[in-house]
Amino acid sequence: VEWSSSERSTITSLWGKVIPAEIGPVAFARVLIVYPWTQRYFGNFGDLSNIAAISGNAKVAAHGKVVLDGVDKAVKNLDNIKGAYTSLSLLHSEKLNVDPDNFKLLGDCLTIVLATKFGAEFTPKVQAVWQKFLIVLIHALSRQYF
């Protein structure tokens, strides 16, 4: 994919304001709450029985940060997201057997959390660039499935 200098600037500027340990847990908890069938991949996380349990779960919070660290890897490798995500794609497809449709659900939840966090700064233009970035990221993460 080709990124214009404006798109690169938008992605890196937005991402530069993100604190993975703050945003990640909220976005990942939202996935588990809004799409409860995704909980099946996290049976070892303990109590995921309700919103309070999920929101207060240390393993959910830790994994949310890990997920955002993965997004950070894509931001730092805009010119080769597919290459940067090869091992993550293999892990999710071959070892964890995660349904790749769940990556879009996570992207949607992350977008909602970012829009909530940044309010008026998360303009339609910023969102359009962010969505383009997520499409590339999700495609790279889903690559080993096909």
UniProtKB/Swiss-Prot annotation:
Involved in oxygen transport from gills to the various peripheral tissues. Belongs to the globin family. Gene3D superfamilies: Globins (1.10.490.10). Keywords: Heme, Iron, Metal-binding, Oxygen transport, Transport. GO terms for molecular function: haptoglobin binding; heme binding; metal ion binding; organic acid binding; oxygen binding; oxygen carrier activity; peroxidase activity. Residues 2-146 form the Globin domain. The keyword Heme applies. Heterotetramer of two alpha chains and two beta chains. Heme b binds at residues 63, 92. This fish has two hemoglobins: cathodic and anodic. Cathodic Hb has high oxygen affinity, low cooperativity and displays a small reverse Bohr effect. Anodic Hb has low oxygen affinity and cooperativity and displays a normal Bohr effect. This is Hemoglobin cathodic subunit beta. CDD domains: Hb-beta-like. SUPFAM superfamilies: Globin-like. The keyword Amino-acid biosynthesis does not apply. Red blood cells. InterPro entries: Globin, Globin-like_sf, Globin/Proto, Hemoglobin_b, Hemoglobin_oxygen_transport. Pfam families: Globin. It comes from Gymnothorax unicolor. GO terms for cellular component: blood microparticle; haptoglobin-hemoglobin complex; hemoglobin complex. One of its GO terms (biological process) is hydrogen peroxide catabolic process.
